[in-house]
């Protein structure tokens, strides 16, 4: 079983480092999508630097969106960027697993027992706001990261 961990990236180096170190023993490839534009359509610099993560270099598939289609709303730009993930799955076979989440949604993959019983699975995760030490105690859990076999993936969004 191979897992392709897929997410959007902006400038979250610390959380990305935590994600790589937490999930690398479970993940075959990390598919990272970054855009030259923010979700409002403003140009921005690319922030991902492979040299900051040399230890994981062979596991990283880094995709850059050069340009969004015209006349997209903010949400449509985000959806376009998330759907761009499929371009990084060309080496995945139909029975490999595709994990889709935000970079700061780090699932506990050691809890995976038997995914074959389900087409789709969502991970119940703790909610933190802005920083690792700001946990939501009122509503502490939500369903964040999702995983399925590539053959069942209709859209990463």
Predicted regions and their residues:
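Conserved catalytic core of nucleotide-sugar-dependent glycosyltransferases
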Residues: 105-157
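Conserved acidic residues
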Residues: 3, 28, 96, 104, ...
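N-proximal low-complexity "stem/linker" segments adjacent to membrane-targeting elements
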Residues: 1-25
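Active-site-proximal specificity loops/subdomain of glycosyltransferases
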Residues: 35-100, 109-110
């Amino acid at each position: 079983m191979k897992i392709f961990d897929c997410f959007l990236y902006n400038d979250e180096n610390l959380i990305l480092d935590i994600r790589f170190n937490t999930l690398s023993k479970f993940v075959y490839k990390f598919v990272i999508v970054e855009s030259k534009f923010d979700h409002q359509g403003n140009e921005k610099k690319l922030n991902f630097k492979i040299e900051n993560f040399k230890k994981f270099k062979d596991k990283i598939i880094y995709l850059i969106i050069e340009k969004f289609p015209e006349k997209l709303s903010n949400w449509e730009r985000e959806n376009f960027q998330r759907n761009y993930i499929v371009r990084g799955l060309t080496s995945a076979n139909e029975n490999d697993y595709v994990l889709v989440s935000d970079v700061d949604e780090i699932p506990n993959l050691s809890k995976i027992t038997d995914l074959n019983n389900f087409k789709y699975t969502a991970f119940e995760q703790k909610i933190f706001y802005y920083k690792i030490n700001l946990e939501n105690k009122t509503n502490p859990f939500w369903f964040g990261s999702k995983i399925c076999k590539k053959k069942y993936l209709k859209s990463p969004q």
